[in-house]
Amino acid sequence: MDVEGAHAAIRLPEGNRWDWDVIAWDGGQLRLAAGYDLAYHHDLELVFGDPFFVCCPGTFHDPVFRAPTAEELLRVTRQVGEEPAVVVAFEADAGGQEPVSCLIAAERFEVVRESVLRYWREDAGPDQRFAPWVRSPDQQVASGPAGPLPTTD
């Protein structure tokens, strides 16, 4: 990750990544995944540790990252009570007539470059991992596609 200051615009590694989505989000982590065809895989993740302010759609295209404005920093600081360690701002195509402004504040930030498959593949290489929802055929039979089967006890 290249950051030229606490709240500078992030610069991503080179590559064709126009499709983006939220791959995971819980209290401790927000993961944005990017690739050129999210139906099959992605090769980049932006990982926000302990996110406490998130304003972005679940899926979007062609984000343009920029430094947050003074107004955006003030907005986040007022809402959370202190200036956050990480603030990432970008404009993206969310399918509407105009780009949407997005803002994410967190304690930590990391860029992960790794091939992540979004479907089961028996011959996946050691340099690939599976998205959280991908299950092997054996796991699907044991638990069903949507989780464990109910018992009739």
Question: What is the predicted role of each segment?
Answer:
Residues M1-D153:
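Surface-exposed, interaction-prone regions used to assemble/regulate multi-protein complexes
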